Swiss-Prot record:
Induction (record text): By stress conditions e.g. heat shock.
Stretch list, region Disordered: 598-635
PANTHER family hit by this protein: HEAT SHOCK PROTEIN 70KDA
Organism: Geotalea uraniireducens (strain Rf4) (Geobacter uraniireducens)
Biased composition (Basic and acidic residues): 613-624
The protein, known as: Chaperone protein DnaK
Family: Belongs to the heat shock protein 70 family.
Amino acid sequence: MSKVIGIDLGTTNSCVAIMEGGEPIVIANAEGSRTTPSMVAITDSGERLVGQQAKRQAVTNPENTLFAIKRLIGRKFDSEAVKKDIAISPFKIVKADNGDAWVEVRGQKYSAPEISAMVLQKMKKTAEDYLGETVTDAVITVPAYFDDSQRQATKDAGKIAGLNVLRIINEPTAAALAYGLDKKKDEKIAVFDLGGGTFDISILELGEGVFEVKSTNGDTFLGGEDFDQDIIDWIAAEFKKDQGIDLRGDKMALQRLKEAAEKAKCELSTSLETDINLPFITADATGPKHLNLKLTRAKLEAICANLIAKLEGPCRTALKDAGLSPNDIDEVILVGGMTRMPIVQKKVQDIFGKVPNRSVNPDEVVAIGAAIQGGVLRGDVKDVLLLDVTPLSLGIETLGGVMTRLIEKNATIPCRKSQIFSTAADNQPAVSIHVLQGEREMSTDNKTLGNFELSGIPPAPRGVPQIEVTFDIDANGIVHVSAKDLGTGKEQSIRITASSGLSKEEIDKMVKDAEAHSSEDKKKRELIEARNQADSLAYSTEKSLKEFGDKIDAAEKQKIEDGLAALKKAMEGSDADAIKKASDELMQASHKLAEAVYAKAQPGEEQAGGAPHEGEAKDEKVVDADFEEVKEDKK
């Protein structure tokens, strides 16, 4: 089995790791950083930029720079979460034919899995550059509180990126694997994971290589992006109060505010006060305006107080579901960049009554855990058993619009559960199975995962036919549902890609598009390399021609000048082969010029070396004689 990489596909940053010599290693990207911004930009020329390159140009290209796409993955355009995003995003979020939230950039529509796939391709390339071989197998992490649609969409993103996704693993569970791999004692731990876009809390029991998740809870729309937004709103309000100008209408200014908010938030984790300086942020009739504000840690904590308060509820619920009290927890592991905020650490301490454990790197631990799980699947890591859970209850709609649960939340996966249902009317020929996920009592308040129909039921009074509905959740947390008429043996099943999500045809098309772009990127790189080499050749040839042009005859000189002109013309185009051909022709034409340069350099070299002023032939003979003598000595 080939190498298996572990990828933490984050809202703000992503990270890739691999097992080497029994140890997990985080791989640095081409820019030398161990984490990569989860950003994608499309330039005027149609070039795709991913990671740091995309982030660098975000201020000047806000409408075509995509970030925090993970918050759209597997979500409906009409959902409350997406409506919130639309209100604050500089890029365009549109409704797809299937009702999903997609993005539109430069007139072209992209699904969230497609954009996420571009980030995954970057992580794949990072691993391949390090290993020196092609990588196809991967373990990808998702927030523990992701529902089925979001998990399926993440798996689709992996497929589009050219990866064989062996397992989708929950982020807190991955962090627990990384933390507990070398721990020998039995302990109960809480993994508190507050990242760029999502918040998860998982309670686990560790012992003898068994990692058992007891419960999980969270909020898939609470993270660093929300903290940044609150800071942006405060900066914009202060500037409006001072200057009377609302910066929120200017996308370029808004992008600068976003960068400043993120920077200030990070700085206030280690200092008590920071300056926010943004010169030339805008202008009016009186001239340019500059933004200069002081932000203290106390003020930041007041600005974000409502978000901090939201962290407590899921923690209490997770403890209750696990049947534990805060005193039963041995360690609280902090995961995600947001846990560096002192106020977050204090909140964790208040909830659990103990100082949180900061022994793991919050940015890298999830990718490390994913790599360990890859090692388990590959057989490199022995004696590790991971028992994860499904975060939300699963069931179907029954008479009266009620949700009847078949699998309760926090059930260990993989799992399978069946229940017998019947018809609601006499001689009912078919039953419609409405698959739901959620904790509310009425089906309309829960998330629809899919609908399918079991038809061909023989005429019978209501309540007589026996329809067995079976739910099957695989190790990725992805749901399969089947319905069987026990009287006829007729069966109908659905693998939930549902009304939400991409069809197989759409995924296949996106895979082809991704491959095409990969070869396009290769061609672009070849063109840039050819241009660089040609530019260097043209410069050195012109320099030599200026110095030694009088040492060669006019016909040779003209041939070189023609070659130079042809090369410059080829460089204006975008045909790498034409540039290479013109470069080769110029090199051929420049042979006489090279001889002249060499001849000029030769006497100088001889004098420098103290060589006698004799002909070339004599020099050659001396070398030959030396060579012969050495050979004879050897004999």
